[in-house]
Amino acid sequence: MGRGTLALGWAGAALLLLQMLAAAERSPRTPGGKAGVFADLSAQELKAVHSFLWSQKELKLEPSGTLTMAKNSVFLIEMLLPKKQHVLKFLDKGHRRPVREARAVIFFGAQEQPNVTEFAVGPLPTPRYMRDLPPRPGHQVSWASRPISKAEYALLSHKLQEATQPLRQFFRRTTGSSFGDCHEQCLTFTDVAPRGLASGQRRTWFILQRQMPGYFLHPTGLELLVDHGSTNAQDWTVEQVWYNGKFYRSPEELAQKYNDGEVDVVILEDPLAKGKDGESLPEPALFSFYQPRGDFAVTMHGPHVVQPQGPRYSLEGNRVMYGGWSFAFRLRSSSGLQILDVHFGGERIAYEVSVQEAVALYGGHTPAGMQTKYIDVGWGLGSVTHELAPDIDCPETATFLDALHHYDADGPVLYPRALCLFEMPTGVPLRRHFNSNFSGGFNFYAGLKGQVLVLRTTSTVYNYDYIWDFIFYPNGVMEAKMHATGYVHATFYTPEGLRYGTRLHTHLIGNMHTHLVNYRVDLDVAGTTNSFQTLQMELENITNPWSPRHRLVQPTLKQTRYSRERQAAFRFGQPLPKYLLITSPKENPWGHTRSYRLQLHSMADQVLPPGWQEERAVTWARYPLAVTRYRESELSSSSIYNQNDPWDPPVVFEEFLRNNENIEDEDLVAWVTVGFLHIPHSEDIPNTATPGNSVGFLLRPFNFFPEDPALASRDLVVVWPLENGSTYAQRWIPEEDQSCLKPPPFSYNGSYRPV
């Protein structure tokens, strides 16, 4: 539907405003008390929005599963966050609750000019109006930029089966499999993006693979380029074919050359282990599967997390309380986990910390390998939050939470146990000290247990699994972390492919790639009036004051304040100061500005040259850190459309910096990019392991408190030596219930001696 179709006149706009104001006055309470202002839509709300949209006859909606692109259908419904100023007035000043609205994305494929249009629908829970949500000024959402739907995948699968009919004998001989009518020996595919070479195109390379556990690691050597830009699937065509290092104009040409003996054929081995009589063993020993192989001596169960007196955190709706912490959360279907209204010690330190985007940028020798630049919000990053397994994905003691997504469906879909919340020991003390008497004994020992609260979810974007953690420490430190695991994106082995990756199996190249993740960090440090400054070390060379004949070199502190956005946008390749501070004009008792420090843990680097073709969709990836002034028009660094139209995306982060606004004593947002280069290696078979493949950042109080706020923790032990040679241990935790899980009595002897 064209945006002009539902344009409102001044009278209509006035009526809409009155409806919204009236709705705000009588908006019902939502789960989680005031935190409900951030809560994801309930199943009832999602259904109400869907029903309201269907009641608008001018939209001419059809079910999303209808197998045609020439239809109007709802693609996404999710909660639309109210404006920050309205939320803060509601939370802090007792103003009325903001209107609760949904964001609805509709694909209008039945229009003469197919398009994608977004609407705000409200008020919830009983919608009565809808209004346009236009893209940023100067941008549009092209029809070709929409994410691929299940219906489109079904049509593409049919097209691939149809187009490869001339290759049935070729497939049987080279792979032992086929498309369609294949029983247990089938072919499947992986599609890559961007889909084409210029804006408006929808031309996708497909990797054909053998269907079996871990099929991502079983390419057949055949890749096809399909043009599927038309709303009529009958018009879709296979434009090119690549097989084992050579290009062909069509499947028919490859089939003909194969029949003529002109194709360099690779016969793929049977991946299943064989018995003595040539029959497949009952349990396949697939290299791409998780089945144990090899021998470890340990066959006992490992340690478990226990909570003898139950959890020390509480959960009310979408509000979490833990020690000094309080925060709300939501699992946004489009982009993932958001932490909101973060308080510590009763004081807000952040309004929002959220995942914005995750990309994986590849190189390769095959056309699919060299084309792959995954921008994962375009693949439903926030909606692929599948079930978490107790004792593996999260401790058995965790609280598991379900999620609802209305994404490419005709109603809300329940994802059980999509999130988990748990406390765990870190295995490292938060702090400790052994105070030696330097005579074989000690004056005291003191230590504070390392305990953290973790909120976790995952995103399984086809081959890759991202584990998303927000971690809360008892000393006011918060950490955001991403762990990468799952299957590597792999292509067919050719000798030339070794320039772009590692040979992982007989016919397999693991393609090198860079993972980058972007976060939005809206810190409110002692209020919304903040500035940005850095601290660095500089060496000085001075005359030694107590020995003037000598020189002294020592570190000094260099403080830099930044007044403009461009100054605070640090590009990859330029030095990034170690101490990155969001500061308040308020001071702590010792005269220092109350601040929070950003500390990045990352091995990221610039991957694409600035301005190079698809790079326009990920301009945030130019900067490990950029600090901007808060604007309601700059809430996300990416969009669900950037993947499929990276050449003219509707969201270009670089534009956030173009006006170069003042950032002194303003409401500030930090945009953080972390990541790492992944050169696959044989130990990535069957899956990439998490150790060494985790990145993130810390938010650390820096002169924010007068002393360590973890002094309030009771997980402390202080041990004193007594004159009789024994020790006295002071503890502040409650006595544990008698049970088989009771740990042994605490003991400590601080002496040391030669032996």
From Swiss-Prot:
It catalyses: histamine + O2 + H2O = imidazole-4-acetaldehyde + H2O2 + NH4(+); N(tau)-methylhistamine + O2 + H2O = 1-methylimidazole-4-acetaldehyde + H2O2 + NH4(+); putrescine + O2 + H2O = 4-aminobutanal + H2O2 + NH4(+); cadaverine + O2 + H2O = 5-aminopentanal + H2O2 + NH4(+). Its EC number is 1.4.3.22. It is an enzyme of class 1 (oxidoreductase). The keyword Oxidoreductase applies. The modification 2',4',5'-topaquinone is found at residue 464. Ca(2+) 2 binds at residues 565, 656, 659, 661. Glycans are attached at residues 115, 541, 749. InterPro entries: Cu_Am_Ox_Cu-bd, Cu_Am_ox_TPQ-bd, Cu_amine_oxidase, Cu_amine_oxidase_C, Cu_amine_oxidase_C_sf, Cu_amine_oxidase_N-reg, Cu_amine_oxidase_N2, Cu_amine_oxidase_N3. Topaquinone (TPQ) is generated by copper-dependent autoxidation of a specific tyrosyl residue. N-glycosylated; the glycans are primarily linear, di-, or tribranched fucosylated complex type. Residues 1-24 form the signal peptide. It comes from the Eukaryota. It is a peripheral membrane protein. Ca(2+) 1 binds at residues 522-524, 667-668. Its main location: secreted. GO terms for cellular component: bicellular tight junction; extracellular exosome; extracellular space; plasma membrane. GO terms for biological process: putrescine metabolic process. Binds 1 copper ion per subunit. Binds 2 calcium ions per subunit. Belongs to the copper/topaquinone oxidase family. PANTHER family: AMILORIDE-SENSITIVE AMINE OXIDASE [COPPER-CONTAINING], COPPER AMINE OXIDASE. Catalyzes the oxidative deamination of primary amines to the corresponding aldehydes with the concomitant production of hydrogen peroxide and ammonia. Its preferred substrates in vitro are the diamines histamine and 1-methylhistamine and it could therefore play a role in allergic and immune responses. Has a broad specificity for diamines and can also act on cadaverine and putrescine, two products of amino acid catabolism. It could also act on polyamines, like spermidine and spermine though less efficiently, and regulate various biological processes. This is Diamine oxidase [copper-containing]. It comes from Sus scrofa (Pig).
